[in-house]
Amino acid sequence: MQFIDYNSQVFFFIRFFVILASILQKQYNFYIHLSIKQVVIPMHFKHINTRHIQRILLPLLAAGILASSAYCYASEGQGMLSPSSGNSDSVFGGNTSSESVTDEKLQVLLNQLQGQLPTGNGSWSVYVCDLFEKSEGSINDQSMQAASLIKLFIMGAVYENYDQLTGTYGKDSVDSSLYSMITVSDNDAANTLTNYLGGGNSTEGMETVNAFCQSHEYNNTHMGRMLLASNENDDNYTCVSDCGHLLKEIYAEEDSGYAHATDMYNLLKAQTRRNKIPAQLPDNVKVANKTGELDNVENDAGIIYDSENDLAIVFLSQNLSDVSAAENTIAALSKEIYEYYN
């Protein structure tokens, strides 16, 4: 369903009408005065050919109506495909509507991608951010199983408490656990760090991870169990936009809100699992990423960097019947996204 912002249309038309009045005043001494409670239109004519005015006024009024409608149409909502330029919660600054060329370009891409997502192999979410133009968009952005993508947020929480943790457990222990957790997706390392965050208590450690997510408005991300633990009572969840916004902060490095953004970036650059987003990209293309897998889940979140057009890309898929096909889908669509911008 599409919604029209009639307030925007009215104000656009008023601006057009004021400009029109100014033109008429200069050419014909035609005066229009507006008050808050009523509209008063006293007119003073000086050698005016009224037919001439009609020939000018009516087409201009029609043009104003068409222009205001076009303005409103350009601002319409896009349903589940949601491009935006900038984000008030991100390092990129304030909100901008989807009227820019960049967002139109992104909308075309999102439409293409949605048409290629599998319809018989699980549920899918996709996020794309043009890191140069600072525009982003998503398909089906909703809470889904995080698998090992929860480790991105464990990493964020650890670095936010880095000084305290290294003071208590030692820098070598914290750093080596971070490296193993991210580069080879070591579950034991993830559990060790979560325990560190809780002062030896895993429940409190998970609460610290969740507090980190809430404080940074990753509102659809939740750590409900330790890695390898049963998901009978709770599970780990995230969404593509939460992962994408964390990647944007990491990519920003010194301009980021995170003191250790460069350290996080370097860990992602050292990733050894390259079978999804990087798999079909040219050999010279650099990707910093983190994967996630369960029996019926295939996820990947990555930054394509040092390219003509750097990008952040996130794929989440769950309830899969064919995980191998899902890996190929992520690889193929990542290649399509890269080639679209580069």
Q: Where in this protein do the model-derived segments appear?
A:
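Short, Lys/Arg-enriched N-terminal segments with co-localized hydrophobic residues
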Residues: 13-42
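Structured C-terminal helix/loop/strand segments within mature extracytoplasmic catalytic/sensor domains
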Residues: 19, 40, 44-50, 54-59, ...
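Short, conserved catalytic-motif segment at the N-terminal edge
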Residues: 119-143, 163
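Active-site-proximal beta-strand/loop segments in catalytic clefts of secreted hydrolases
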Residues: 129-131, 181-186, 193-197, 224-228, ...
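Active-site SXXK
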Residues: 143-167, 181, 313
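Conserved catalytic neighborhood of penicillin-recognizing serine enzymes
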Residues: 164-209, 219
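Mid-domain, small-residue-enriched loop/turn segments at the edges of structured enzyme/sensor domains
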Residues: 194-255
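A conserved catalytic-loop motif detector
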Residues: 233-293
